[in-house]
A protein has these predicted regions:
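ATP-dependent phospho-/nucleotidyl transfer catalytic cores
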Residues: 223
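Short, basic and Ser/Thr-rich N-terminal targeting/leader segments
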Residues: 20, 30-33, 94, 101-103, ...
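Glycine-rich, flexible loop/turn motifs
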Residues: 47, 57-58, 106, 113-119, ...
């Protein structure tokens, strides 16, 4: 009876918080899922909703339609709001603050009337190699292929008809925020994936803007770059209010009222840093999903230009080095799905948790070979700059004498998933001697205890911490950033202290240290992985991208 009373009291307590607006909502657009998370003022998730989606090829480029964006947003919000009403008896009419986050980079370009000029070009597209090379050389600063400025400049170089009409361009998070508030702003972390940010002023690098505008093909355009970019805002800055039109876009039922103050819209790198408490200098995180990035907050700028390392900022505006790989779980999920089909075919269907857990644990069983027994896998569904691949073809290969076991197979899947991101991380830690006090892993792959954590420790030869919030991901991190609007000081300089002292003060974590034999095994696998990349090039030449 006491337990029932306590549960009822807890529900009543949370219902009161919902009525009082002591909640914040974070919504993140990932590559395969849009997730909405509502948290209370103790940073606990009290309701959530999600919607699955996938990019598609449009004229040879990866894209999502605006109908998919808005339909997906509403389809993630609705079950969260329903969750609130079902669990706590409250119709969700208001929340304290809202924040939107999304996969970074890409290209959403609009004319003066606010009309989309070309289909959304996502970060997955690697058709911007010429722009990447020319801008990196011009700035002496790495401009990756997926950055928004590379997409704009490539369109200029291609003499695309829409370029002269561009009045504004932004990221996915910036687009959603703009349509819901009317404000053309962007969190500084997301902005740093559009165009380089000065970590001192937290604005765009003016010298680079001047160099860009001076390029003859750019000077011929009717616009100046600074007039096209969203305004960067550091975490804790109010970023506009939900308009009446915006409220209806988010919640077509009309229950949600306008006037809610929004946080600056951020990128998935920034929300990953927040979700892992990795915004302080010499800390880092590995955010793993459809793509993967490893990030370290830097003490100072890197000594040299490294194409393998992106320089972005934390949501507070501090410089961070990032190794980003386009490909991570897509190929892995396809193989796991195949095993799931087999289980169903023999009349023994298993749920996703058991399926992934069983297969993942096989990868670290006592009888596996540390180097995967001669098995080799390439997880490239799309192009991969780090590996020099313009397109992707998932591949599995082995020598005739390889030790083909389930454990070795799954180990090869996981090793290969972490291999592309290792390329850039090795540049930072081995060439630039970047010091890392801690690395925290987050994302759904870490939900199975120890497995991905242990393999990542071997890949980077460094201890990997996973926190109790590991599977919360970016939507929760965005909700925390929205909560920070209540806690910030005037100069917004204490995000790291806020996370340490408020959000993560009681957080539980586990740490896996690298095992010497695993490190040696990974390095052996990685050497074969690198040596075998010509196999991937041959596949690109001989297998059509859209073959079915």
């Amino acid at each position: 009876m006491a337990a029932t009373d306590n549960a009822a009291e807890q529900v009543a307590h949370i219902a009161e918080k919902i009525r009082a607006g002591k909640t914040t909502l974070g919504i993140e657009f990932g590559s395969t899922r849009i997730k909405a998370v509502l948290i209370d003022d103790n940073f606990q998730t009290i309701a959530s909703g999600d919607y699955s989606w996938a990019s598609h090829l449009e004229d040879g480029l990866w894209s999502y339609t605006t109908e998919e964006i808005w339909g997906g947003l509403q389809s993630a919000y609705a079950p969260m709001a329903n969750d609130v009403e079902t669990a706590y008896g409250e119709k969700l009419t208001h929340v304290g603050h809202i924040g939107f986050s999304a996969m970074m980079h890409g290209y959403l370009a609009f004319d003066e009337a606010g009309e989309l000029l070309v289909p959304f070009r996502t970060w997955q597209n690697t058709n911007t190699s010429e722009a990447h090379k020319k801008l990196s050389e011009l700035f002496q600063y790495n401009i990756p292929e997926r950055w928004s400025i590379a997409h704009l400049y490539q369109a200029v170089l291609n003499k695309e008809e829409h370029v002269s009409k561009v009045a504004y361009f932004t990221t996915l998070a910036g687009y959603v925020h703009w349509k819901l508030t009317g404000k053309k702003v962007l969190g500084v972390g997301d902005a740093s994936g559009m165009f380089p940010i000065d970590p001192t002023t937290h604005t765009y690098e003016t010298a680079f803007i001047e160099k860009f505008d001076a390029l003859p093909e750019v000077a011929a355009q009717p616009w100046k770059l600074e007039n096209l970019l969203p305004e960067p805002l550091v975490a804790g800055t109010p970023a506009g209010e939900l308009t009446e039109e915006g409220a209806k876009l988010l919640d077509p039922s009309g229950a949600l009222k306008p006037g809610i103050v929004l946080a600056p819209p951020e990128g998935d790198a920034g929300t990953g840093m927040v979700a892992t408490n990795s915004v302080r200098v010499r800390t880092g995180n590995v955010s793993a999903g459809t793509s993967i990035f490893a990030m370290v907050v830097l003490e100072h700028k890197l000594k040299a230009l490294h194409p393998e390392v992106d320089l972005v900022t934390t949501p507070a505006g501090d410089l961070a080095g990032m190794s980003h790989a386009n490909n991570f779980t897509s190929d892995l999920n396809a193989w796991v799905g195949l095993f799931g089909q087999f289980a169903k075919a023999i009349g023994q269907p298993v749920d996703a948790g058991m399926l992934y857990g069983t297969l993942f644990r096989a990868a670290i069983a006592d009888d596996v070979d540390a180097n995967c027994g001669g098995l080799l896998n390439y997880p490239f569904r799309s192009g991969e700059f780090l590996a020099g691949l313009p397109e992707g073809r998932p591949l599995f290969a082995r020598s005739p004498e390889a030790n083909m076991t389930l454990g070795n197979f799954m180990r090869a899947q996981l090793f290969s998933a972490f291999s592309p991101v290792k390329i850039g991380m090795d540049v930072m830690t081995k060439q630039e001697r970047v010091q890392v006090d801690s690395l925290v892993g987050h994302g759904g792959i870490f939900a199975t205890p120890k497995v991905a954590q242990k393999i990542l420790a071997a890949a980077f030869n460094t201890p990997i911490k996973v926190m109790s919030t590991a599977a919360e991901g970016g939507a929760w991190g965005m909700a925390v950033l929205a909560n920070y609007l209540w806690n910030t000081n005037e100069d917004h300089s204490n995000l790291a202290d806020f996370l340490d002292g408020c959000v993560f003060k009681d957080a539980q974590s586990t740490t896996e240290k690298p095992v010497a034999s695993d490190v040696v095994g990974f390095e052996d696998f990685f050497a074969r992985f690198t040596k075998g990349l010509p196999i991937e090039h041959a596949a690109i030449e001989t297998i059509n991208l859209e073959d079915k």
